[in-house]
Amino acid sequence: MRIAFFLSVWLVCLGAVAAPNAPATLDRSTWPEQLTSPALFDVASRAEILAFAHALLISEALDENALKQRLGLKAINVDAIDNLRKQMWQRLLSNYNFAQQSCDQDASFCYYVDGMVSLREQAGKFAIADDSFYIAWAEPSREFHQRYLDEQLRKAALFPQISSEIALFGDQESNGDTMNDRLFLLTFDSGPTQSPGTTDWLADYLRKQSIRASFFVLGNSLQMRLDKSGGQAVQALYKDQCVGVQGWEYRSHSHWQAWQDSILRSVALVRQVLPDNYLAQFRPPYGQRREDSGAFFQGQGMQVSLWDIDAQDMAANLGAEESAQRVLSLMLLWRHGVIKFHDTQDKVRTALPWLLKATAQSGLGWEDC
């Protein structure tokens, strides 16, 4: 068993690592079962948790130089990486415990785990037999989890010099960590589009599905839409939805001298046009914001709203269904959280219906904004 584990470490070190601009995704057709019940969702969830835990454990065997090489960085924040790994292990343990609650209905991927030691032990020896019902999923899943883990480790390695959603700066910031099991919140960034556009289609689709999502608008895009369509049309557009801000324009708010003005102008416009929809939250573009911004947001009565699951729908090399499959794989792994799409991307017209159809019988809930 120890030989197999260290062979895995060696193969990871030798293998080509995806570039930071190549988001990880997993072809869900390699999984042999549809998620047609809460128990089958749990089976797939247990498998993804163990596969990711295996990748996480392997990464811990790399020294600092090997990790730099793997992530393609000259310098890394080792403390931030260690903190992220600890958080991931805690969440994996909690998630596996939730996923085990249906083991009496289907025992696939149910192993003895009563704490962190036994979880790490099971992760170390996790493997899919060649004659397994799940063998077609095994290698694509291994590749997905290694690439996804590298995405996250790279963000931690650069934090806080380059801020991102990977960690919180303080109490004025939030993500979906504290949400209940099987509960997810849909969020959409960077709109609105001009009429008629994807924002129109999306808001109408969500209303038909009885889902209230959070839209984080750009002030300049909202102003252009307002100038063209008028206030009543904009109010009709966002009916039954929540509207936060992403700043006046889509740019990093970490080193921009006018970052406060960007937020205040956007908030003023949303509160003027959409007072009943206003959500006192700021979604930083790229997740980049100032480490010392907490006092400002506290003074404005606002929260910085980050995310747990990134659809990566702005990536040119990721198709709409690939984006949806990435989201579903991460929903199985993390079991709750905030999902980020962009309503400026036409991909969401395909990705979101695919996602809702794939999870319709899985016993999931969509958080009300």
Model-found features: residue ranges?
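Short glycine/proline-enriched loop/turn "hinge" motifs that connect secondary-structure elements
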Residues: 176-178, 236-237, 331
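Short, intrinsically disordered/low-complexity patches at protein termini
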Residues: 268-269, 329-330, 363-364
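Alpha-helical, coiled-coil/dimerization segments enriched in small aliphatic residues
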Residues: 189-190
